[in-house]
Amino acid sequence: MKKEKISIIVPCYNEEESLPIFYKEINKISKEMKETDFEFLFVNDGSKDKTLSILRDLSKKDDRVRFISFSRNFGKEGGMYAGLENATGDYVAIMDADMQDPPSMIKTMYHDIKEEGYDCVALCSPQHVGYNF
């Protein structure tokens, strides 16, 4: 039986310091979730630091890592849209590389989709509780 795939879309702008930490955490979570396959789709949004170089290295080491690189900065929404257009997973999550939201939440969100029967799940971090959207 074919495993379902989760695509993790990660818009990136000048994330050279965050990427190694984020990748380590998301890779750890993916190994814990043996029932699923993963795709890590990073979107480099015209970064001026070593973000693109790090993404190239990660994609050579891990065939689950793919990246798109913009020649200039289009903003986070442009990166999210490009990621959504290119994701190949059965499920999609958008995460920030700075780990504002912990990658471990992927397990909870996947459980809620599969076991609770939701069509869509979202995360609201404790630091955002009380904000009016």
Kindly label every feature range from the protein language model.
Residues 1-28, 35:
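N-proximal low-complexity "stem/linker" segments adjacent to membrane-targeting elements
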Residues 44-52, 99:
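A conserved acidic beta->alpha catalytic loop
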Residues 10, 23, 34-46, 68-69:
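Short beta-strand/loop segment that forms part of the nucleotide-sugar
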Residues 30-36, 59-64:
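Short helix-capping segments at alpha-helix termini
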Residues 17-21, 49-58:
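Acidic helix N-cap motif at the loop->helix transition within catalytic regions
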